[in-house]
Amino acid sequence: VAAAQMGAGIVECDVAFTKDRELVCRHAQNDLHTTTNIVAVPELNAKCTQPFVPADPASGTPARAECRTSDITLAEFKSLKGKMDAYNPMATTPEEYLAGTADWRTDLYASRGTLMTHKESIDLFKALGVKFTPELKSPVVDMPFEGDYSQQDYARQMIQDYIDAGVKPE
């Protein structure tokens, strides 16, 4: 919305997929641990490729986590709250990990971000009157995903969302 309000004529949705093969907008398939509250939700953190591991100050080992859209279902994805992309590598708790925004950035929107499906982005962009372009993200998981969801299936599904929404190619 901010991009359209600031005059952007073309807005994009970076498309990734969930465990149940629903398309969502994400900068990367594996950025949920730094862009959402997933590590602070125990039942979802447990599903992450690498659940949150606290830093070890004694050894200097940084905190780590890796949470992918393909680790969770669409319903679980939609339950998350978006935040500024940041983390605290010296965190010993999930809350500290999420509070890693650099001083020169703002946390004004840190806990209120709404995560969107690809279909929701199409509807929003149409309502805003902007042009849009999808970016099909390269999966970080092996394809075909879970044995039968190929890169071609993923691309076809994205295109089908536009067809279903009545978007004509230009």
Region locations from a protein language model:
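Phosphate-group recognition and catalysis centered on beta-loop-alpha active-site segments
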Residues: 1-170
